[in-house]
């Protein structure tokens, strides 16, 4: 669901409401790929629980998301990873650079607005640490960034009773880092060990 000047709006408000109604009838959380525009407004009106991407979210929309206590998931690499631009034609690259400035402003505004968030990779798997670094660079506190890739992500997925933090009774899944990401978020890229279900696998 988008409806920016560049991306089509695929679902009507009535269709979104039907999705939400069916999901709630079986206690399923709803989420939408949503960059901004009318699509974002319609997702909120329909009752979608989580908005993915929000690249073009406006300040009035930030205020509404905050008031209605919805989740957002930031996936900044598609907009901020300059290495991806080399895959584009020179014409498209120029347009993407212009969009980058707009997206940075919108995401920074959402972060400043205090929205509760998770952080994801969208289609760029294996890059979660870099996504976290981008969000830190856009103004989020490192503690909030860490929550975005751990407990908040688990809450969004409805899995926070079994994972997302280190606590008795939860899955023993965690990474050991060389440094402290609260001091330097880049420490997320310096993994020295990985424990999965209580077993050292790296």
Residue map of PLM features:
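His/Asp/Glu-enriched, well-ordered alpha-helical/loop segment
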Residues: 99-180
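Short aromatic-centered micro-motifs
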Residues: 194
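Short, small/polar residue-rich loop motifs at catalytic or cofactor-binding pockets
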Residues: 187-189
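Short glycine-/small-residue-rich flexible loop motifs, especially phosphate/cofactor-binding loops
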Residues: 20, 40, 62, 107, ...
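Small/polar (Gly/Ser/Thr/Ala-rich) solvent-exposed segments
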Residues: 183
């Amino acid at each position: 669901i988008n409806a920016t000047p560049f991306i089509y709006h695929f679902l009507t408000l009535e269709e979104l409401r039907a999705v939400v109604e069916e999901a709630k009838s079986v206690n399923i959380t709803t989420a939408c790929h949503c960059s901004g525009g009318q699509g974002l407004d319609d997702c909120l009106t329909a009752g979608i629980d989580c908005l993915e991407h929000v690249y073009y979210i406006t300040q009035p929309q930030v205020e509404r998301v905050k008031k209605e206590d919805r989740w957002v998931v930031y996936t900044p690499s598609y907009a901020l990873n300059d290495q991806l631009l080399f895959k584009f034609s020179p014409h498209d690259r120029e347009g993407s650079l212009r969009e980058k400035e707009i997206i940075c402003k919108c995401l920074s505004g959402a972060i400043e607005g205090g929205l509760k968030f998770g952080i994801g990779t969208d289609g760029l798997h294996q890059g979660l640490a870099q996504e976290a670094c981008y969000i830190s660079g856009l103004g989020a506190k490192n503690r909030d960034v860490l929550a975005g890739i751990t407990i908040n992500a688990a809450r969004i997925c409805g899995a926070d009773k079994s994972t997302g933090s280190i606590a008795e009774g939860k899955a023993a899944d965690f990474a050991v880092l060389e440094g402290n990401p609260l001091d330097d978020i880049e420490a997320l890229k310096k993994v020295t060990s990985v424990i999965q279900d209580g077993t050292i696998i790296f």
